[in-house]
Amino acid sequence: MTAIRGGSRRAPGLALALLGGVLLGACHGDENAQVNALPGFVSGSVRKTAYDGASDDLLTAGLGKTGLGSDTRPGFANPAQPSAAELRRLAIYSNYRALVDITPNGGYGRFWGPNVDLAGNDTLGEGKIAGTEYLAYSDDGSGRKNVTLLVQVPASFDPANPCIVTATASGSRGVYGAIAAAGEWGLKRGCAVAYNDKGGGNGAHEIGTGVVTLIDGTLATASSAGSSSLFTASESSSTLAAFNSAFPNRYAYKHAHSQQNPEQDWGRVTLQAVEFAYWALNEQFGPVVDGTRHGIRYRPGDITTIAASVSNGGGSALAAAEQDTRGWITAVVVGEPQINVRMTPGVTVEQGGAPVPSFGRPLADYATLANLLQPCAAAAVAATGAPYLSALPMGVTQSIRTQRCATLAAAGLVSGADTASQASDALAQLHAAGYLADSDLLQAPMWDSQAMPAIAVTYANAYTRSRVTDNLCNFSFATTNPVTGAVAAPAVSPMTNLFGAGNGVPPTNGINLVFNGASGGVDHRLATPDASFAGAFCLRQLWAANQLGIGTNVDAVRVAANLQHKPAIIVHGRSDALVPVNHASRAYVAQNSATEGRASQLSFYEVTNGQHFDAFLSVPGFDTRFVPVHYYDEQALNLMWNHLKSGAPLPPSQVIRTVPRGGVPGAAPALSTANLPPIVQSPGANAIAVNAGVIDVPL
């Protein structure tokens, strides 16, 4: 590991976290200087580490295709104090598996995986990729932003034909969050990959001990880390001590509790990741100008750069392309983007020639509504047979559904004299709010898995710039008793391996979402018979009544859907129940056509039987009904590459009508090309019509 000096801040012990370090000199400046100078936003040292492609590598951290596919996750020599290298290995393992179906029958090793080349053939063996990593913080000088930037340069990078692919983290994941979604394709293509964690980065602060994470996942106390922590709660030590006394075993999380509404900067930090990648490539391939320092070989626009990723990372790529004023980004390819669109009058989303009931709502709106209604809607007849995605006994879950329906009815929020009719009304309200009937079987697992409650709580905190001490709507993050769900001290602190195993949005890695009631904090599902309805209703009211500045902060994250005529592809699963296609991709495409008109180069591919979490596809009931959207994300990247490099036309917007695998839940037959029709140049009746602010998607 080589540490390249940047600004003045240093994380204690960071230079010792990886072995073999020496220091090189560098300075801040701009790309017009003769010397390749670090961008001014880079704070502290840049750490450069080479990987041989055998014992360790860029894509699999030395695990290879076999190791990533194994259910046995990599361990630590000393479980109480894992090394930075061990935490990196676990982070790559965990994040890779979190975004794709890792089962052979589901397509791993056949359609994707380290062994599969870009033509879809099994030719790459274990798929380890040698190369170099550059790691640093981006900050505004306060030491409180500390966005993690990471550039991977594969040994196959061709300086004469340079390319960059962005891989902004999805969700609130750490910096390796999109390694499977975009990083893998970029590395195989021989491109540098520009990662960033969006200012969330799985950063946590254990309030009771004061322990925080550093840039490489190793731990320090908040006082010793200072401004070099990934995240430290902003409250004074005395305030945190008082809070810990009243609410022990609690955790602050960066996305939820940084008070910075980080989403408003996701486009900007993605552009910074690209600029940092330019610096790294100039550092590695630029001419030596004074015997030690490198000059500039690549200037903005010189490198073919595809902004790519999925979910929040996909939204970040779109925002970056909109904000790009210097030519950093050449094209965009994103999957299931979580994007909040600033809709203008006259823009319309239609399906089958008829306007959809609702479109273009921001996440703060649809997520708080879904979190309120989903536990009840899950009991609707139309949701019968939904995959079960909860560790709770089915009887407990059924009771939650019945009680949530009853409480909603008592509050006048659903109608009906019995659970069945109340549940049908709850589901009808979700339909009226823009959720498609294609998502009916996913309403239950989105709530049962706690994906929707986690999103609702984290984003409500972020959009209201709340502190951990606020216990917004009486929710907080804590370790709990595995039997009762009551807040309890952990047997082993979850902080030890948080960087490697956490996802940045509790519940994760043993840190759970709890509701603070009269009897103390309890897992929100078990705190009251109706699964903490009061808290869910409070979250909904934040948006409905525009409380605590939520409207202003949501407006700050909205985008204009102006891609500045850059070629772009959006892929989205029609059945997505986490980021509904009406509110995200369809709305974005419609608004883009109003904004850019005929100059738009955006194609939209909507995948039937596609949903948000490919990692769920091995779960019984998911395997038989849904197909991998990731397969089409990779096809879209190939299409864009061919467009940029050989002028091949991008296929027009279309519905891709996939075929579910079928069979018995939990034992679906192997995925095959019969399930996955290609994206075509002439979609015929499957063409999506987009014109002058109106999108019409075939039924």
Swiss-Prot record:
It comes from the Bacteria. It catalyses: (3R)-hydroxybutanoate dimer + H2O = 2 (R)-3-hydroxybutanoate + H(+). The keyword Zinc-finger does not apply. GO terms for cellular component: extracellular space. Residues 1-33 form the signal peptide. The keyword Secreted applies. GO terms for molecular function: hydroxybutyrate-dimer hydrolase activity. It is an enzyme of class 3 (hydrolase). InterPro entries: AB_hydrolase_fold, OHBut_olig_hydro_put. Pathway: Lipid metabolism; butanoate metabolism. The active site is at S311 (charge relay system). It is found in: Secreted. GO terms for biological process: butyrate metabolic process. Its EC number is 3.1.1.22. Keywords: Hydrolase, Secreted, Signal. Belongs to the D-(-)-3-hydroxybutyrate oligomer hydrolase family. Participates in the degradation of poly-3-hydroxybutyrate (PHB). It works downstream of poly(3-hydroxybutyrate) depolymerase, hydrolyzing D(-)-3-hydroxybutyrate oligomers of various length (3HB-oligomers) into 3HB-monomers. This is D-(-)-3-hydroxybutyrate oligomer hydrolase. It comes from Burkholderia pseudomallei (strain 1106a).
